[in-house]
Amino acid sequence: MLSQAQLDEFEKNGFLKGDVVLGDDEVEALREELDKVMNGETVARPVLNRNMLESDSPYDNMKMIASERVVQIVNIWMASDRFLKHAAHPQICEEVAQLSHTNSLRIWHDQIQYKPPVTGGPTAWHQDHPLWPIIQPADLVSAWVALDDAVIENGCMWMVPGSHKWGNHQRYLSSTKDFKPFHKQPEMLPNNAVVEAVPFEIKKGQVGYHHCLTWHGSPHNRSEMKRRAIAVHYMPGHTRYEPVGEHVMLSYVNVKPGELLVGDHFPEVFNKAKVQI
């Protein structure tokens, strides 16, 4: 459970470093599962498995020759019971519920991001919720767990403190040559907005939380180290299906616009009144 000081820090900054929640054996087990999914060794498949910098096809076999890549796997929990169990991690879910001010949580979707050594590419500055144009309101919180130490040298995430309070600015976000964020029309920002990024280094097995409107991104991995992580994007129980655009999860929605987003592909993983899965 998070302390009041931690809750206040998240409210102020839009991100928070949590505890080390996975031991070495648990991390290694998830790494092995990840390798199986990437190599196509599982019967079930995730929703998406691709190089973010190269392809938009629904499923790629990861045997790529691109000079840079960021391996993205969406909903690895659908291909791996071990990752489903991770998504229902009791401490993570309890703390996300605190940060989301909710008594229940469902998986919106999860996401592996793997930046291989030397050739790991950047992830552009962005806000999550504007890229999810089928759900409202913007109350989601993500739990990002490092499967390798994520440090400046291997392309850790960077965050802009307080940016979750500024609204939707996704279309105006860009970066300098040295990966500093900037806003294409800064006059649209609040008068007190300070666009200054800070590194969000996360230890292997540690969890980091961020709000769905927090500006974040990550630069190249030019080191000899891998940078693997599993992010689970959790939606509070009051999240509704409000489609205004396309999304990879759209085909899995079986409710009407305006209704709560529920269903087998959006499993409940936390409820104070029920036993968790």
Give, region by region, the residue ranges found by the protein language model.
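Non-heme Fe(II)/2-oxoglutarate
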Residues: G40-A44, L48-N49, Y59-M62, H169-S174, ...
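A short secondary-structure junction signal
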Residues: T119, A124-Q127, I135-Q136, E153-M159, ...
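Double-stranded beta-helix
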Residues: D8, A150-W215, T239, G258-L260, ...
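Non-heme Fe(II)-dependent double-stranded beta-helix
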Residues: M1-K12, D19-W125, W132-I134, G245
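Glycine-rich phosphate/pyrophosphate-binding beta-alpha loops
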Residues: D128-L131, L140, W215-N221
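Short, conserved beta-strand element in jelly-roll/cupin
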Residues: P133-I152, E201, Y209, H233-P236
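Short, surface-exposed loop/helix-turn segments at secondary-structure junctions
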Residues: D56-S57, Q127-D128, K177, P181-V195, ...
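Active-site region of the double-stranded beta-helix
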Residues: N103-L105, H129, I134-I135, V145-C156, ...
